[in-house]
């Protein structure tokens, strides 16, 4: 597995970044809606080896039990499960590269969103409801029904208007914050791989 860079992502990463206004965010909706529906492109892979840590990868190994191999999903656990174990329906986080490009404003800040995969593809509820399967390199992922929403870290990094934007009714319909998925077939995926919706 090839690692391009290891980055420590703090909760309050910069002091000189201007967060976008509601109007500026809404102006990006048309571009987001133009994302391809059936075959997209994987633009960034991020592994989270520890809390507030990010590793930018050129490829990732996807495993049925671990999700992204080396990621802290399984070790981190979840407050949404009765026993605090990792949530099986939130194993993989995927975000639209068009959305993160809008809210982050700079590609060097994409990793701050905290997702593992950033794809140029329509992630909306209409195009990718729960149960949709995606060919991810040699692996296959299945979209789950667990919602993926902006939180306080998202506010700190991208602003309160960005959080309102992704968590709004329209934002939820378009899955602007992204989608959750799980591995149903293990394999390897690389930056630049085509991501295909399986029918």
Where in this protein do the model-derived segments appear?
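Metal-cofactor-dependent catalytic cores
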Residues: 1-199
């Amino acid at each position: 597995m090839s690692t391009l860079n290891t980055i420590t992502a703090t909760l309050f990463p910069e002091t000189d970044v201007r967060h976008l206004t509601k109007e500026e965010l809404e102006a990006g909706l048309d571009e987001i809606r133009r994302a391809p529906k059936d075959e997209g492109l994987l633009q960034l892979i991020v592994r989270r080896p520890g809390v507030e840590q990010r590793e930018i990868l050129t490829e990732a190994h996807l495993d049925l039990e671990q999700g992204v191999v080396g990621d802290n999903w399984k070790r981190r656990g979840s407050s949404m499960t009765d026993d605090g174990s990792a949530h099986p329906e939130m194993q993989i986080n995927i975000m639209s590269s068009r959305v993160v490009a809008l809210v982050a404003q700079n590609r060097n800040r994409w990793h701050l969103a905290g997702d593992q995969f950033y794809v140029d593809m329509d992630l909306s509820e209409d195009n990718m409801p729960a149960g949709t399967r995606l060919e991810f390199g040699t692996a296959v992922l299945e979209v789950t029904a667990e919602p993926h929403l902006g939180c306080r870290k998202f506010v700190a990094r991208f602003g309160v208007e960005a959080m309102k934007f992704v968590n709004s009714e329209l934002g939820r319909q378009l899955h602007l914050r992204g989608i959750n998925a799980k591995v149903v077939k293990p394999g390897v995926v690389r930056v630049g791989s085509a991501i295909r919706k399986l029918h």
